């Protein structure tokens, strides 16, 4: 086991987050921040961030991102970032892995933090697809690990059980993996493993053979009774000449009531999501939409941010609801993310190219970060607001191959709700000629304050 020690990271300071004044009308979104992360040492591109907020302390933020050490993507590490003052100052930890990607963080019930990444395991084989788990018991100041959950993984994510169910406090790790079925053929499977001891160890994983199609799992969530919900999407079939893309990609939901040992049949959520990782969120509030599931994704050609919701634990889903109402006649949107705060307010953020000018090869355009919220359980959305104060353009010399690989800052970005109901955003932004992290905080005034 290795312990990683800190080097200081400071943000360019901005005025602290202010609450909405008493005369602000319901439905107003207040943006504070757009603060650039500034680090000592070599200036390297940082991309694909993920963010977690301590459910017991909104000033305690933990993030992770990919650090690109060579612009041709041949060398990449990951780093974690921790803040104890609401994101004004941060401390950075470099994992110092020989190869790293897909970072994801989660804070447990007792404050234990888990970080998962894909990478090469130190002292083991040279495979770059180990699912590696790091653990911090001191709020993110130091890290122990990694332990490997095996090879052949992609897009691993974490969920924490904060329910009143029998598995409260558990961490769930989900990923797409490969396994050999009884016929001897290797299939794409959904992989789920549970830890009941704060990430020190994991139960034998469940590997789900769902079809003969290529699939990717997405981020799981846990309902108020402890039911685990795992989304996945299938997108291609195997042929003698390689993978053949399906005409329509499909999004599915699986549920488990026994801690991830067994699962329901796949329940269809959408056939409208194309060319992106979807994101799942659940309403944790005690309000009228408690346990409502929200699925966010992009449509074909990156034209729309689409939201679907289910009020019956994933059995039935609404038709897609367009979120980006103000994107114009030639919309371009990417990397949407969704979360729900303590009051049941649904927050959605995405990269938007409405002001980006001419496109290069259809998919490469300058973008800005936009945010909106729903106060009625996803039926309607407030007018979206621009969060970033400048455009981010991916195709820049200092970004190198990174702009081609991640034209919108990564396959995902960080969006989380604080215990007092605000939303915190963390994204990769190349306004400074290469991808660097930026953060902002948003308050949605969901009711008139007295």
Regions found by a protein language model. Give the residues of each.
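Extracellular, repeat-based ectodomains that mediate carbohydrate processing or recognition
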Residues: 19-450
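Bacterial N-terminal signal peptides
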Residues: 5-16
